[in-house]
Amino acid sequence: MNNKFKDFFGFGDNDSYEERDAYEEHYDEQEEMQNSNRPTNSRDSNVVSIKAGQAGSGPSKIVLYEPRVYSDAKEVAQNLLNQRAIIINFSRMDDASARRVVDFITGTVYALNGEIQRIGDKIFLATPPKFETDGKIT
């Protein structure tokens, strides 16, 4: 009778409580293992997709450039990375420097899967991948 009284008020045999605690510990360990295998979406991540800036809802833009020195090529390439088409006029640049800029922009266009076309004497059109050009200038 003494044991029934202890069991009724929870002071009796602790075997059932120990089994429940062991089950909960095992369950918690499994849950921690599953959570540790999930990829984290940290805001501190240093990896950024090139295509991250492509989802802009604003209108598409065409940027006009007349570079004078080779260092202007970096700004032109940055606009391509931002999904803007570019018309480049090399008439104010010597031929050797213009060739170097065209090579730099061609590499950028190739990396982005874009396109570059000569549309006039010393004038080029460079476009990111989602632009289409039709027609020819003669």
Curated annotation (Swiss-Prot):
Q: Which family does it belong to?
A: Belongs to the SepF family.
Summary of subunit composition and partner proteins: Homodimer. Interacts with FtsZ.
**Keywords for the protein's UniProt record, in alphabetical order:** Cell cycle, Cell division, Cytoplasm, Septation
Q: Where is the composition biased (Polar residues)?
A: 33-48
**Which InterPro entries does UniProt cross-reference here?**
Cell_div_SepF (IPR023052), Cell_div_SepF/SepF-rel (IPR007561), SepF-like_sf (IPR038594)
List every stretch annotated Disordered.
1-59
Q: What is the protein's known function?
A: Cell division protein that is part of the divisome complex and is recruited early to the Z-ring. Probably stimulates Z-ring formation, perhaps through the cross-linking of FtsZ protofilaments. Its function overlaps with FtsA.
Please give the GO cellular component terms listed in this UniProt entry: cytoplasm
Q: Which Pfam families does this entry report, sorted A to Z?
A: SepF (PF04472)
Record's HAMAP family?
SepF
Task: Give the protein name, as stated in the record.
Answer: Cell division protein SepF
UniProt KW Mitochondrion keyword: no
Compartments it resides in: Cytoplasm
Query: Source organism's superkingdom?
Result: Bacteria
Q: Which GO terms describe its biological process?
A: division septum assembly; FtsZ-dependent cytokinesis
